[in-house]
Regions:
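The conserved acidic donor/metal-binding loop of glycosyltransferases
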Residues: 99-103, 129
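Short aromatic/hydrophobic "clamp" motif used to bind/position activated sugar donors
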Residues: 95
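Conserved donor nucleotide-binding strand/loop of the catalytic core
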Residues: 52-85, 89
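Acidic helix N-cap motif at the loop->helix transition within catalytic regions
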Residues: 21-24, 49-57, 107
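Conserved donor NDP-sugar-binding/catalytic core segment of glycosyltransferases
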Residues: 107-141
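N-proximal low-complexity "stem/linker" segments adjacent to membrane-targeting elements
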Residues: 1-31
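A conserved acidic beta->alpha catalytic loop
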Residues: 29, 44-53, 71, 99
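Conserved nucleotide-sugar donor-binding catalytic segment
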Residues: 147-186
């Protein structure tokens, strides 16, 4: 576990299966966050390309935890899901999921943690807008979902597409209360 200061620890879980062309940029985008109290849990989910070799290049960083699964475990595999394995290894009070072909803007976590600090303690999840980036022609499109308020976390877990998948930052206790027994979380 890595904790640089007294700010709450944020764990970012990165599941990876055959994304060797993107994984380095993905991991680096978390390590370059302006919010410094982070740990990165990278799960190589049985990749058959060079993903694991690229992930291992980050093993020198104390903020990075690497989990190697010998074979691919698909979502919804119950107690053996890659997300559940990573969640159980994480130490953060807040959990984010970043897919291996995506990346964060440098101040994403800082802005979300600032928002948490301004909200009532009953708020369990905050999310943000994002961009869709098309590498082939180097274009980006702002991607916004409608705003939700109230007790939406259970619906978020069940529906899985209420917000941009990589945008939520969730209090650990929400996962512990709701559980990890669905397709999205395993």
């Amino acid at each position: 576990m890595y904790k640089e200061n007294t700010n709450p620890l944020v764990s970012i879980i990165i599941p990876c299966y055959n994304y060797d062309q993107y994984i380095e940029k993905c991991i680096q985008s978390v390590l370059n966050q302006t919010y410094k109290s982070i740990e990165v849990i990278v799960v190589d989910n049985g990749s058959t390309d060079d993903s694991l070799e690229k992930i291992i290049t980050f093993s020198h960083d104390p903020r990075v935890v690497i989990i190697e699964l010998k074979e691919n475990i698909p979502p919804g595999s119950g107690t053996n899901s890659a997300f559940r394995i990573a969640f159980n290894k994480s130490n953060g009070s807040y959990i984010g999921v970043l897919y291996a072909d995506d990346w964060y803007l440098p101040d994403k976590i800082e802005k979300q943690m600032e928002l948490f600090s301004q909200c009532a303690s009953s708020v369990g999840v905050v999310y943000c807008h994002g961009y869709r980036y098309f590498e082939k022609d180097k274009t980006k499109i702002e991607f916004k979902q409608q705003s939700f308020r109230g007790y939406v976390f259970k619906d978020y877990l069940k529906e899985g597409d209420v917000v941009i998948p990589i945008s939520p930052l969730v209090k650990r206790c929400c996962y512990e209360i709701i559980g990890l027994n669905n397709l999205w979380t395993g």
